[in-house]
Amino acid sequence: MTKREERQAAMGQIMHQRFHEPWTLAQKPFKVIENVYFVGNTWVSVYLIDTPEGLILIDCAYEENLYLLIDSIRGLGFDPKDIRHLLISHGHFDHCGAARQLQEMSNCEIWINEKDAYFFTERRDLIAFEDRVPEFRIDHYYDSDQ
């Protein structure tokens, strides 16, 4: 097997695990600092910020492991329905694939980078694993310089 074939086989195993065995990616949530918590998994970092106005989530992973995210948030004593803002760091499916489900559950406002918004509004066909990113309502845009 060539090096390229080995890499492709390894990537196939990783993708299978991500989509068909998400429980293998479970990670215990933990406090990072003061009011910031890690609620992601071993593959994708997701952060929860507790504010007086409600919860802010930075990224949300993807549909297949949304239940892990919800379990992590609840495990820290928070209610996922209290998420007010979801900030998507970038347009990869594993950082925003569960956005619509979270929006439906909590009615959170979604923030996305202006440059990434193009792919969600104009060129969804250019999103890798597009079928893993259900359409969602974009409420606000942020600039990379902010």
Regions from the PLM with identified roles:
Residues 1-22:
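Accessory terminal helices/loops
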Residues 12, 53-55, 84, 131:
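A short, structure-level motif marking secondary-structure boundaries and short turns
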Residues 14, 18, 43-45, 64, ...:
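Residue-level detector of flexible, active-site-proximal loop/helix-junction positions
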Residues 22-76, 80:
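Conserved beta-strand hairpin/beta-sheet module of binuclear metal-dependent hydrolase folds
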Residues 36, 64-67, 74-146:
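Active-site HxH/HxHxD metal-binding segment of metal-dependent hydrolases
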